[in-house]
Amino acid sequence: MKKTVLREYAKLIAKVGANVQKGQEVFIQAELDQPEFVAMVVDECYKLKAKKVVVDWSYQPLTKLHVRYRSLKTLSTLDNYEEARWQHYVDTIPCRIYLISEDPDGLRGVNQEKMARSQQAKYPIIKGYRDQIENKYQWCIAAVPGEKWAKKLFPELRASQAVEKLWEAILKTSRVTDDPIQAWEEHNKDLHDRCEYLNSLHIRELRYKSSNGTDFTVGMIPEAQFCGGGETSLQGIFFNPNIPTEECFISPMRGVAEGIVYATKPLSYQGQLIDGFWIRFHEGKAVEWHAEQNNELLTKLIEMDEGSRYLGECALVPFDSPINQTGFLFYNTLFDENACCHLALGMGFADTIRDFQNKSLGDCRKLGVNDSMIHEDFMIGSADLSIDAVCDGGKVVPIFRNGTWAF
């Protein structure tokens, strides 16, 4: 891929995605296989007058070794220097950039029970810090084609060809055009206009139906609103958290969901794929589920904590979205969640509550926003998915027909 094009992508991530501010610290998380592109992003952050840019490198084989050889006690311990870093985030409110490129199968064979228990043990400590910075900082997740990820999508190609083809797909769906910034301004306006219409309906519940067996109803929080595209932090800074994005999303009412949903794409979770699964909800809670592939891992996900059994997000994405039109299954949630409609288990978003700026996080949760240590999207969109909105007064308004917008 031409370096001039990659430079435009790096600029898009730093300026439009994270919207790095003068004097702000930046923390970047990336895989070891992307040093050249990471350097471009770091350069763009400094051009935006970042105070300091720190890169935290990760490597899946090392994660597997840590889980294999360290005791559960040491894996479950948050050392003083790790807590100090979280306190630093609270004190300085840096922006965060996540450059994802990992192998979808990179953690196959790892002890999932050990990983889950260590995460559960550390979460109560991390949560205290995370709650203090909720909605205060900018963040952006964007993708870079790792070789093993690319080969997963295109096994028939040589590694270099597979990487190039994945680059093309990432850049196209991320709107890296002749003028990416203008393209994103137009895209954000379209998503904003759709959210405005949805919010004008005063929706009480959404009803989903598809020929694959999905028959599901979920309740809305009266004070909630649909959001999409860019967001504004509590510091007043506009940013785009996901590159790419195609969704209009809302956090539903905790405890109000009935019926069954069938996943239409595999879920990449903890370096493994969960496929062919369905989940049944009663009184908002996942009460029954099954996966043809990695059912045990699906169970670990749903049983991670009390909140992981409940929904944190309902996202509306047309089945003919640019990502779905590529014809690829990306084996990556950032892309696959923006290919079609999805739900998310776990944590809801406080910023979907109207006037959240003047409410505490606790206030938002009392209104019905779910709390959990996880937030995992799974795709339920299909070519014949219908969604109806039941609005105040009982009026029924079609939202989706044949998998796409009905308005």
State what each model feature region is.
Residues 1-258, 389, 395, 405-407:
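Active-site bordering "gate/hinge" segments
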Residues 11, 199-201, 270-272, 307, ...:
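Short solvent-exposed loop/turn micro-motifs enriched in small/polar/acidic residues
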Residues 205-208, 277, 287, 383-392:
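Short polybasic amphipathic segments
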Residues 219, 289-290, 400:
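Short linear motifs in exposed loops
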Residues 250-306:
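Long, well-ordered mid-to-C-terminal structural blocks that present hydrophobic/aromatic surfaces
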Residues 256-258, 274-276, 283, 309-313, ...:
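Active-site lining segments that contact anionic ligands and/or coordinate catalytic metals
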Residues 286-357:
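Dual-mode signal for accessory low-complexity, basic/Gly-rich regions
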Residues 362-407:
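Extended hydrophobic packing segments that form well-structured cores
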